[in-house]
Amino acid sequence: MQEIEIFCDGSSLGNPGPGGYAAILRYKDKEKTISGGEEFTTNNRMELRALNEALKILKRPCRITLYSDSQYVCQAINVWLANWQKKNFSKVKNVDLWKEFLEVSKGHSIVAVWIKGHNGHAENERCDSLAKLEAQKRVKTTT
């Protein structure tokens, strides 16, 4: 299995409000950056959207280390998700995105590593800036 690193971040102005996401995929010395957003969303949804969109790019099963400043995403992947499935996602927020995650993560081995946000982690800072930029693009202005 190829070893891949994924760094992701999500942003929401207002939470909920205009949101953006960004992810960096790294395999050896190759990198791919993706970003996007939605007009009305939350930071947790954008963080998860970043991960799902990154996973969709991968063509074969990989061993993935995910780096995120979202304890919600890291804890869900490492701890909560199996139990959520057993309980049919009862009382779980963002069920649509978690079910999508289960689909796009099939075949992959994923370990999520929490990193402190805004703490000088280069890839996290890049994702944070891109996600904020994507969110700002979706702010509606009144004239």
From Swiss-Prot:
Instruction: List, for all copies, the residue spans of the domain called RNase H type-1.
Output: 1-136
Q: Which family does this protein fall into? A: Belongs to the RNase H family.
What catalytic reaction does the record list?
Endonucleolytic cleavage to 5'-phosphomonoester
Primary localization: cytoplasm
* Cross-referenced NCBIfam families: PRK00203.1 (NF001236)
Q: Detail which positions bind Mg(2+) 1.
A: D9, E47, D69
User: For this protein, what does the record note about how its cofactor is bound?
Assistant: Binds 1 Mg(2+) ion per subunit. May bind a second metal ion at a regulatory site, or after substrate binding.
The Swiss-Prot or TrEMBL record annotates one GO molecular function as:
RNA-DNA hybrid ribonuclease activity
Per the record, its GO cellular-component terms are:
cytoplasm
Designated name of the protein? Ribonuclease HI
Entries under InterPro entries matching the protein: RNase_H, RNaseH-like_sf, RNaseH_domain, RNaseH_sf, RNaseHI
One of this protein's GO BP terms?
DNA replication, removal of RNA primer
Listed binding positions for Mg(2+) 2 are: D9, D128
Per the entry, which co-factors are needed? Mg(2+)
UniProt EC number: 3.1.26.4
Q: Does the keyword Hydrolase apply?
A: yes
How does it associate, per the subunit comment? Monomer.
Any keyword Magnesium? yes
